[in-house]
Amino acid sequence: MFMINILSLIIPILLAVAFLTLVERKVLGYMQLRKGPNVVGPYGLLQPIADALKLFTKEPLRPATSSISMFIIAPILALSLALTMWVPLPMPYPLINMNLGVLFMLAMSSLAVYSILWSGWASNSKYALIGALRAVAQTISYEVTLAIILLSVLLMNGSYTLSTLITTQEHIWMIFTSWPLAMMWFISTLAETNRAPFDLTEGESELVSGFNVEYAAGPFAMFFMAEYANIIMMNAFTAILFLGASHDPHTPELYTINFVLKTLALTITFLWIRASYPRFRYDQLMHLLWKSFLPLTLALCMWHISLPIMTASIPPQS
């Protein structure tokens, strides 16, 4: 039975990832006044299936000088971690109701750094290594603000369990009470998932394709799927943290529809940002974090610590 539960979580995620690639190409196409993919199937709807067939039937070549075991383990680890992070997300009921769901998600997103580092190092290519080092520095840096923002939100929430956020936001969304945090969180998730304008790891002009430059066929597809699964997961997490949908136990489907629509809106915002903004320079990226976001998040964290203490004496309003 548990296997069916896992499959009922993984298969929709993989389908969503497949069609997100199509949505991205369509959105970028229309924003650049062109059609996007429109040959395979009606309106290009079968393009993701054609892409998957092409990638998984291709021969997976690898450089002769690469470290075989790490080269193969890295994409498997990336995809496994990307799918594992969905486990504690309440939609409205999580697959496993963890007591410390938020900490689990932070730990998993930190582990994802290893797959990037291994892939860059095992490829034995200088471009892949530079791309991997950039990705790791960026991911680790932005995780600092993500963790502090999460702490601030959870202090208002009163629990590390993600399901509690639904109850907390019954009356008002957290985005209204903590909008500076929500803005910084959204920008940090862009950086965390290596998306434009923070996609320095894939700077075509200097690094070809970044840490996955030596990958082809199946392993490349796994990295690609991991990246897009992470994008959807981060947007789902944002929707739970700041745009909590009201949950009626009698009609859980309404919560799910609400949640999916919010996640979709945030994901399309990601694509919109990609079409609109140029890439940051590396020093600007680091300055934004260490000189702007970190002091602000620390100050807001102090505020979120003191606010519940100050209001503790006020009796609850029924």
Swiss-Prot record:
The keyword Nucleotide-binding does not apply. It catalyses: a ubiquinone + NADH + 5 H(+)(in) = a ubiquinol + NAD(+) + 4 H(+)(out). One of its GO terms (cellular component) is respiratory chain complex I. It is found in: Mitochondrion inner membrane. The keyword 4Fe-4S does not apply. One of its GO terms (biological process) is mitochondrial electron transport, NADH to ubiquinone. Its EC number is 7.1.1.2. Disulfide bonds: none annotated. It is a multi-pass membrane protein. Keywords: Electron transport, Membrane, Mitochondrion, Mitochondrion inner membrane, NAD, Respiratory chain, Translocase, Transmembrane, Transmembrane helix, Transport, Ubiquinone. GO terms for molecular function: NADH dehydrogenase (ubiquinone) activity. The chain crosses the membrane at residues 2-22, 68-88, 100-120, 146-166, 171-191, 223-243, 253-273, 294-314. Its main location: mitochondrion. Core subunit of the mitochondrial membrane respiratory chain NADH dehydrogenase (Complex I) which catalyzes electron transfer from NADH through the respiratory chain, using ubiquinone as an electron acceptor. Essential for the catalytic activity and assembly of complex I. Core subunit of respiratory chain NADH dehydrogenase (Complex I) which is composed of 45 different subunits. HAMAP family: NDH1_NuoH (MF_01350). Belongs to the complex I subunit 1 family. This is NADH-ubiquinone oxidoreductase chain 1. It comes from Sus scrofa (Pig).
